[in-house]
Amino acid sequence: MSKQEEAELILKLYELRREETMRKARDWFFRDFKPQTMADFNNAMFGDHSGHLRMVITYWDMAAALVNDGAIRAELFTDCNGEHVSVFANIELLLPEIRAAYGPQFAASLEKLIDATPDGRKRTATLRERIKGIRETLAKQQAQKA
């Protein structure tokens, strides 16, 4: 694939992220989806935001598959995207249980990309802690306002 074709794929992925329903799904996923248990995950999977959950995870799993299969170079993809790391960090700790319930291929391409990325698992762990700190700070700020 030419560099121009790769660039066009990257831009297409960006354009798809801007679609209205996808934007709402991403907003929900990063703002409100905080699964600590498999019950939390199942509540989302079968609740009002089922479509949002599936849309975000399958979007980034599909994008990862494009990288894993060589349609987009990993270096270019990771230079242009970081959101996939956050998505994986949000489900990583529950992944064995999720796969037991929903099948072994759940987010498999996303995991493969994370594992192929230098320090990929370290990045997800660091990001998970950073997000936890941000949420704690926001909760304190909300409590002070009340």
Q: Where in the sequence are the language-model features?
A:
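Acidic, Ser/Pro/Thr-rich low-complexity regulatory regions
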Residues: M1-A146
